[in-house]
């Protein structure tokens, strides 16, 4: 009887430990909105020593929902919520992403129509997009370093809304219609926007 009791006791202790290992406490859900500065990689580590999110974000359990290239600025959504990441980035969701884009030259109606209808890039025809000529945004912050402008060629601003997310898509689209991108700022993804965040600033939100 004693042998059985001891054996049973050991089994119960083992089972409790196994359950504890199999069911770790769930990490708190986090959703951060970050205004990524120019020349910052959208990741926490880099073997080449370039500037990453590590210098700005104190949490390491979040990941970027969609890319924002090193030479682009603006809204980066960081979260550990897989469902939210999918909603913001999966092509089938067609979540609108708004960009303010400074281009070389002044696009005419033909160029804007091409952007709206879709242009054929190396990876295929782009989805219809929003594209309009706008004034320089009032909330615009200075970029460091500033863009390189040619004195003989004017620049202008476009507001472009994409419903897909290909690699460097905005830059390739504007170049395709003859107006290279000089500066690219993502302002919003779905109903999430920069608001009044300045470069390098972030905030945590819960109502999403």
Curated annotation (Swiss-Prot):
A single GO molecular function term of this UniProt record: RNA binding
Keywords: Isomerase, rRNA processing
Biased composition (Basic residues): 1-12
Entry-linked InterPro entries: PsdUridine_s_RsuA/RluB/E/F_cat (IPR042092), PsdUridine_synth_cat_dom_sf (IPR020103), PsdUridine_synth_RsuA/RluA (IPR006145), PsdUridine_synth_RsuA/RluB/E/F (IPR000748), PsdUridine_synth_RsuA/RluB_CS (IPR018496), RsuA_PseudoU_synthase (IPR050343), TruA/RsuA/RluB/E/F_N (IPR020094)
Region (Disordered): 1-26
Catalysed reactions, as listed in the record: uridine(2457) in 23S rRNA = pseudouridine(2457) in 23S rRNA
Active-site residue numbers: 69
EC number in record: 5.4.99.20
Domain of life: Bacteria
One GO biological process term: rRNA processing
Keyword Nucleotidyltransferase: no
Family affiliation: Belongs to the pseudouridine synthase RsuA family.
Function: Responsible for synthesis of pseudouridine from uracil-2457 in 23S ribosomal RNA.
Protein name as annotated: Ribosomal large subunit pseudouridine synthase E
Organism: Yersinia pestis
């Amino acid at each position: 009887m004693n042998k059985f009791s001891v054996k049973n006791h050991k089994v119960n202790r083992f089972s409790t430990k196994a359950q504890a290992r199999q069911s770790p406490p769930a990490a708190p859900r986090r959703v951060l909105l970050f205004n990524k500065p120019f020349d910052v990689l959208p990741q926490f580590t880099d073997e080449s020593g370039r500037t990453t999110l590590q210098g700005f974000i104190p949490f390491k359990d979040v990941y970027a929902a969609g890319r924002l290239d090193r030479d682009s600025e603006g809204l980066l959504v960081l979260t550990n919520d897989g469902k939210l990441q999918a909603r913001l980035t999966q092509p089938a969701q067609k979540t609108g992403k708004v960009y303010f884009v400074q281009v070389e030259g002044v696009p005419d109606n033909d160029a804007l129509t091409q952007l709206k209808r879709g242009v054929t890039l190396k990876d295929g025809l782009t989805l219809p997009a929003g594209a309009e000529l706008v004034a320089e945004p009032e909330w615009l912050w200075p970029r460091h370093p500033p863009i390189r402008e040619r004195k003989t060629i004017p620049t202008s601003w476009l507001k472009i809304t994409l419903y897909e997310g290909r690699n460097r898509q905005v830059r390739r689209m504007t170049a395709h219609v003859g107006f290279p991108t000089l500066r690219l700022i993502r302002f919003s993804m779905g109903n999430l926007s920069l608001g009044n965040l300045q470069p390098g600033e972030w905030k945590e939100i819960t109502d999403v």
